Amino acid sequence: MKKKIYEGSSKILYSAEEDFLLIMAFSDKAILETGETVDISGKGVLNNNISSFLMDKLEMIGIENHFIEKINMREQLIQYVEVFPIQVIISSVACSRFVKEFGMDEGYVFDKPIIDFKVRSREFKYPIVNEYQILNFGWLTRDEIKAVKEQALRIYDFLSGLFIGVGIRLVECKLEFGRVFNGEESIIMLTDEISPDNCRLWHINSNEKLGFELLEKEPNKVFESYQLIADRLKEK
């Protein structure tokens, strides 16, 4: 019997038979801004398919990530990673906090993608944290911060091109990284997932919102939206 190690808002981690491997299961849960949890039937299956596909694509261009293989409709086998206590947010278009905090027009396109770091803590509501704080808190070394930024931008550039190819704009995405030790050396590795749960996706022509942004106002369209994204990616 699998031993549950951790349960988050939309995924559950279980132990695997081999050391340093885990099983990651995608659930149908979603959390609203109010903190209420809702179920979107079938969402976990679609996210497993989408994330598996995108992680495979990233592996092909040399991005080390924790994905090993898809086990079944909801589960995948992953490498154990010592996850950094930060999220890396990359934005190429004004949305969300850029509109609320800076008064920018939604949809304004930045000259270059902007990187933000947030503390990976729902309890503290994911506060923004800067590089100096990350360094002084001992969370990452200077070289690790540099490597994470370089990888994040490379990932974002690749995913943006891939989504444009299927008529979708990648407006923003949230990435997580960590360390995998190889003797005395460590490797920076992409972890978590890449799916409509952590990517802000819009129709490229109409700017119609897709994915998690529909949860609050049009929850009845969420599954249909995730399915559209999965179907478009099948074309690749």
Curated annotation (Swiss-Prot):
It holds the Pfam family SAICAR_synt. GO terms for cellular component: cytosol. GO terms for biological process: 'de novo' IMP biosynthetic process; cobalamin biosynthetic process. SUPFAM superfamilies: SAICAR synthase-like. It comes from the Bacteria. Its EC number is 6.3.2.6. GO terms for molecular function: ATP binding; phosphoribosylaminoimidazolesuccinocarboxamide synthase activity. The keyword Signal does not apply. It is an enzyme of class 6 (ligase). It catalyses: 5-amino-1-(5-phospho-D-ribosyl)imidazole-4-carboxylate + L-aspartate + ATP = (2S)-2-[5-amino-1-(5-phospho-beta-D-ribosyl)imidazole-4-carboxamido]succinate + ADP + phosphate + 2 H(+). Pathway: Purine metabolism; IMP biosynthesis via de novo pathway; 5-amino-1-(5-phospho-D-ribosyl)imidazole-4-carboxamide from 5-amino-1-(5-phospho-D-ribosyl)imidazole-4-carboxylate: step 1/2. InterPro entries: SAICAR_synt/ADE2_N (IPR028923), SAICAR_synt_PurC (IPR033934), SAICAR_synthetase (IPR050089). Keywords: ATP-binding, Ligase, Nucleotide-binding, Purine biosynthesis. HAMAP family: SAICAR_synth. Belongs to the SAICAR synthetase family. This is Phosphoribosylaminoimidazole-succinocarboxamide synthase. It comes from Rickettsia massiliae (strain Mtu5). The gene is purC.
